[in-house]
């Protein structure tokens, strides 16, 4: 007879880093009796979630996709950002057959190359250096008409920081002697991931038909006008730059974001023949629509950089060992706790169940800082009490999503809501003899103001993240841990040998 599972719960507090600086630190300011008690009574420490420790360039802040990939893989996963940057440096990028093939088709027919992407040095969804390289590639291969449709950031970068990025691309086009920025729009519209199709349609119509709320002679003038309307980068409304540019039949369209989750909705509008989420005024017969990476196996668009496969990630290895698992999150982070945590796999593993709790329908999450955390917690407590699962993996979105708003008071409320939820999980586990690991994927909410500019700090950080063991074992947290060490730690607690593919090592050692 098999023993009843007493679940091991991995609690991922998204965007919940650690900083010893109390100023503008929502975690420090929050009333969080549960978290404080756990830190005082349970084995705890800090682990790294940024830079080379997660497969990103040195000094690069972590993000949710990267964090969950590393958490689930049990090894450092070298990220698409790093792969693309290396290919540009090595020159391989300029010979990439998917990119060159798309450009050559357009050039051969005397047509245009349209480059879409987040124009930012944030490095979370894209990097401006990649957009520069794409413009250079198009020019090298003879494209005369090169148009950049720039999505502005202000979320993974300071809220009003797009000027330098626009100047970089303007200078690039001037140096090439061809090409220009054709449109501006905030990522709030172009990069939605919560089925707000009215936002996506504004971006689609701007790119395809140059349908804009505002026009400007230059991109910098368009940005200045948006700031005058009190629109920060993320929220810049559809702005046509210069003469109208449309996506015509035979043009090539290349989406230069390397992160998938916020590239899917707009891509679907471009490539799905039976798309019904909004009425497309026109669907051009493009020579090619390319994604820099694979945005989804279900989206029919070639990827310039195909996904690298990861074998024996935590979910797969649990399934092979007959263990049951539950993945749960609200909409904003559901892809992270499923697709990314599973190493880029869409389908559940055998014995894996998933629960999606809808995120609240508010314009920005400072308006509802608790988000759907109470509802997520209801379902977790229920699952713990049922004792059906060996492992439960939950993501709480609040620290990251409310942190991104830059509203300090709301961020404090988000942390306090999380504290209540964690307390409910710990109490439920105590009743059944379960255990938990509490950690985060990257920092955010611990720094809510930019100390240099005084602006709201809406981006992620490079701070370490907490790691707390909740249970009865006599263990301690070793130093030097990284996100890739979390899965091997879980396997050790479950009494399973880690697979050879997992190069991480347990963060917990005997006390």
Curated annotation (Swiss-Prot):
| Organism of this sequence | Pseudomonas putida (strain ATCC 47054 / DSM 6125 / CFBP 8728 / NCIMB 11950 / KT2440)
Mention any one GO cellular component term assigned to this protein in its UniProt record: cytosol
**Gene from which this protein is expressed:** gpmI
EC annotation from Swiss-Prot or TrEMBL: 5.4.2.12
* Entry binding sites for Mn(2+) 2: 14, 64, 441-442
Q: What is this protein called?
A: 2,3-bisphosphoglycerate-independent phosphoglycerate mutase
**Which residues are responsible for catalysis?**
64
Binding annotation for substrate: 125, 155-156, 187, 193, 259-262, 333
This molecule's function is given as:
Catalyzes the interconversion of 2-phosphoglycerate and 3-phosphoglycerate.
Cofactor stoichiometry and binding remark:
Binds 2 manganese ions per subunit.
Catalytic activity as recorded in UniProt: (2R)-2-phosphoglycerate = (2R)-3-phosphoglycerate
């Amino acid at each position: 007879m098999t023993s009843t599972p007493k679940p091991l719960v991995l609690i991922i507090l998204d965007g919940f880093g650690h900083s010893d600086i109390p100023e503008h630190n929502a975690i420090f300011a929050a009333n969080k009796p549960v978290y404080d008690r756990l830190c005082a009574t349970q084995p705890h420490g800090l682990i790294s979630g940024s830079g080379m420790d997660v497969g990103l360039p040195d000094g690069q802040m972590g993000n949710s996709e990267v964090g969950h990939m590393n958490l689930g893989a049990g090894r450092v996963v070298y990220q698409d950002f790093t792969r693309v940057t290396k290919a540009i440096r090595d020159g391989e990028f300029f010979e990439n057959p998917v990119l060159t093939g798309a450009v050559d088709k357009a050039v051969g027919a005397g047509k245009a190359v349209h480059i879409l992407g987040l124009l930012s040095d944030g490095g979370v969804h894209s990097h401006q250096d990649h957009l520069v390289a794409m413009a250079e590639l198009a020019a090298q291969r003879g494209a005369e008409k090169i148009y950049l449709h720039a999505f502005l950031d202000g979320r993974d970068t300071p809220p009003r920081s797009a000027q330098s990025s626009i100047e970089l691309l303007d200078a690039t086009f001037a140096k090439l002697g061809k090409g220009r920025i054709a449109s501006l729009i905030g990522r709030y519209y172009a990069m939605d991931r919560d089925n707000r199709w009215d936002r996506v349609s504004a971006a689609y119509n701007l790119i395809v038909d140059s349908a804009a709320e505002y026009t400007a002679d230059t991109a910098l003038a368009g940005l200045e006008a948006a700031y005058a309307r009190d629109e920060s980068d993320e929220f810049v409304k559809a702005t046509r730059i210069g003469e109208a540019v449309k996506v015509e039949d035979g043009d090539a369209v290349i989406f230069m974001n390397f992160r998938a989750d916020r590239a899917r909705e707009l891509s679907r509008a471009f490539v799905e023949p039976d798309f019904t989420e909004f009425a497309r005024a026109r669907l051009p017969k493009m020579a090619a629509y390319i994604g820099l990476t694979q945005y989804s196996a279900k989206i029919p668009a070639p990827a310039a950089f195909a996904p690298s496969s990861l074998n024996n990630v935590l979910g797969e290895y649990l399934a092979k060992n007959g263990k049951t698992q539950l993945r749960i999150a609200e909409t904003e982070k559901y892809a992270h706790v499923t697709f990314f945590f599973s190493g880029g796999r869409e389908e559940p593993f055998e014995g894996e169940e998933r629960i999606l709790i809808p995120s609240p329908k508010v314009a920005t999450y400072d308006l509802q800082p608790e988000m759907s955390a109470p509802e997520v917690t209801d379902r977790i407590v229920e699952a713990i009490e049922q004792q059906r699962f060996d492992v439960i993996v939950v993501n709480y979105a609040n620290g990251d999503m409310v942190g991104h708003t830059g509203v300090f008071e709301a961020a404090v409320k988000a942390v306090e809501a999380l504290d209540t939820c964690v307390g409910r999980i710990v109490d439920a586990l105590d009743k059944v003899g379960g255990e938990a690991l509490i950690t985060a994927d990257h920092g955010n909410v611990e720094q809510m103001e930019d100390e240099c500019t005084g602006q709201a700090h809406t981006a992620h950080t490079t701070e370490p993240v907490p790691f707390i063991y909740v249970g009865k074992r006599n263990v301690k947290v070793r130093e030097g841990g990284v996100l890739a060490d979390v899965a091997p730690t879980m396997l050790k607690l479950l009494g399973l040998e880690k697979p050879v593919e997992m190069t991480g090592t347990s963060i917990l050692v005997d006390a």
